[in-house]
Each structure stands twice: as C-alpha cells, then as structure tokens.
C-alpha cells in the first residue's frame, strides 16, 4: 500500500511526526511518497482548513469523494508535546482510531489518571473552538452558537458563566449581552491548537462542541456537555436542560479507548498506530 505524505501543508511542528510515520509505514512493508495524489492513502496534518494547512481541505475532500481513506495527524491533548493523534478521516469521534473495548495498558503506559468527580464547582465554562476546522462544518457561526448556548443555560440556572474563545478564533463583546457572564482570554499553548490551560477546581461543568477541552475536563473530573462528534460523547451529557444535575458516569472504559487515539513519536515510528488501525 502506498501512503502519500503531504508534508508541505503540515504545521511547523509536524516534521518529526511525519518522519516517524514514514519509518512506521516502511517497517510494515508499505511504501511512501511525498506531496502527491498518486497514492492509496493520503496523509495530512490536521483538519484545520486555515493558514498553511488550508490546501489540505481539497486533498481531504477529493480523496473521500474517490472512496479513499485519509490518515490525519494532529497535536494530541493527553500529553501535550508527547502524544499525537493518528486517525482515519478525522481527529474526533467521526474518525476511525481502531477497535474499542481496549484494556488499560496504554492508560498505564501514558500515566493517565482519572480524577474524582468534582461536585463542588460553581462555574460553567463554555469553550469555543476554531470555526475554520472541519470539526465545525454544518454548525452555525460561532457567535450564534455561544449566544444560543448561554440563552439555553439561563432558562435553567443563573450560575456564573465563563466564556473562553479559542485562542485563534476570537469573538468580541458576546459576554456583555448577559448578566454574570465574563470572558476569560486563553493564552495559546505552544505547539497546540487548544485552549485548555485553566484550573478546573471551580468548574461545575464544561461545554465544548468537539475539541480537546471536553476530554481534558472529563479526565479532571468535570462533567461535560458536547456534540455527538466529540471524543467525550460516550460519557458526556447530551442535553443542557440537565445542567443543574449533570450526569457523572463511570469513565474507565472511555479512557482506555481514548488512550488509543494518541501515540508517542517512538510508537509512531514503530508502526503501532497503523497496526491498531489494522494496516
């Protein structure tokens, strides 16, 4: 099988991950070419159709229209700068990361640990994401989504709300339209596209459509409300009407499976994520 690595449209931090993937691919007996459509499996960096990665959108859509799978690499959220997402046709729950029902081996290897559910938090966090991402397609403008979300929350509770925009997708002034809603400006975390750099000790819940803040919140013991494409969906709350009494399920199996969505550079070079994807 021939993999086409689109390195020219990768993020600046993507070079070592592409290099590791090439080693992993060839170790399994497959072949590699660069920046070409003449391949069985295109490999792109991220599904953020913006900046230097914008051309990946055409590559992705053309391949999918042709019935080809697309291998997507992306910054990880479990161990920043250490683990990297490797999935087919996406980076969230729409993607194929291999079989579910996994054991705890990778959770233990990565040193992941579920924190107890936080039942004493007071603040509702709404975490935005980049609206130029494939993850946000078919969604309303980010500003409308935030306004609708706050309006829905206010039908149930007057709790303090903190709105945190994605560091690369700013929205101004939204918080001024409501009482007890404030903005918390995230600092961009080096080598990531997420904004989960805050202390969740006072968090009652986190609302996030389909990006990293929801999965990180769950690990830290904070209930989440997400869309169906979120990797947090299996253990997330689905309806904001229950925000005063959020669901706090067992997260053990969920974390076991989540650990198989991200891999270290060494593991990628050994072909382990490809083996898990049954290549």
For each of these PLM feature ranges, what is it?
Residues 1-46, 50, 133, 275-279:
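N-terminal pre-catalytic "stem/leader" segment of glycosyltransferase-like enzymes
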Residues 6-8, 45-47, 73-77, 121-133, ...:
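Short loop/turn segments at strand-loop or loop-helix junctions that form parts
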Residues 34-36, 144, 151-154, 159-162, ...:
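Donor nucleotide-activated moiety binding/catalytic core segment of transferases
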Residues 14-21, 52-58, 140-152:
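Well-ordered, non-membrane alpha-helical segments in soluble/globular domains
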Residues 223-226:
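Short hydrophobic beta-strand element within catalytic cores of glycosyltransferases
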Residues 34-64, 205-209:
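Short, well-ordered secondary-structure micro-motifs within conserved domains or adaptor modules
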Residues 115-171, 264-266, 270:
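Active-site donor-nucleotide binding/catalytic segment of nucleotide-sugar enzymes
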Residues 3, 83-122, 234-279:
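Leloir-type glycosyltransferase catalytic cores
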């Amino acid at each position: 099988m021939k993999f086409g690595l689109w390195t020219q449209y990768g993020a600046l931090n993507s070079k070592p991950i592409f290099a590791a993937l090439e080693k992993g691919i060839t170790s399994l007996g497959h072949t590699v070419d660069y920046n070409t459509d003449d391949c069985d499996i295109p490999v792109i960096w991220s599904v953020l159709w913006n900046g230097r990665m914008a051309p990946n959108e055409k590559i992705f859509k053309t391949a999918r229209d042709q019935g080809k799978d697309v291998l997507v690499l992306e910054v990880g959220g479990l161990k920043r700068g250490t683990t990297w997402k490797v999935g087919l046709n996406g980076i969230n729950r729409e993607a194929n990361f291999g079989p579910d029902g996994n054991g705890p081996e990778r959770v233990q290897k990565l040193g992941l640990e579920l924190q107890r559910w936080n039942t004493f938090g007071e603040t509702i966090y709404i975490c935005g994401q980049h609206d130029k991402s494939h993850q946000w397609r078919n969604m309303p403008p980010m500003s409308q989504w935030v306004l609708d979300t706050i309006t829905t929350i206010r039908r149930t509770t007057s709790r303090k709300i903190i709105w945190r925009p994605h560091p690369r997708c700013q929205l101004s002034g939204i918080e001024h339209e409501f009482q007890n809603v404030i903005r918390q400006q995230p600092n961009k975390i080096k080598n990531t596209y997420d904004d989960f750099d805050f202390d969740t000790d006072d968090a009652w819940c986190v609302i996030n459509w389909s990006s990293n803040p929801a999965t990180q919140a769950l690990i830290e013991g904070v209930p989440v409300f997400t869309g169906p494409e979120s990797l947090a969906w299996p253990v997330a709350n689905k309806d904001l009407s229950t925000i005063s009494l959020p669901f706090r399920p067992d997260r053990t199996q969920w974390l076991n499976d989540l650990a198989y969505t991200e891999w270290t550079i060494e593991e990628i070079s050994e072909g382990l994520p490809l083996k898990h994807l049954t290549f």
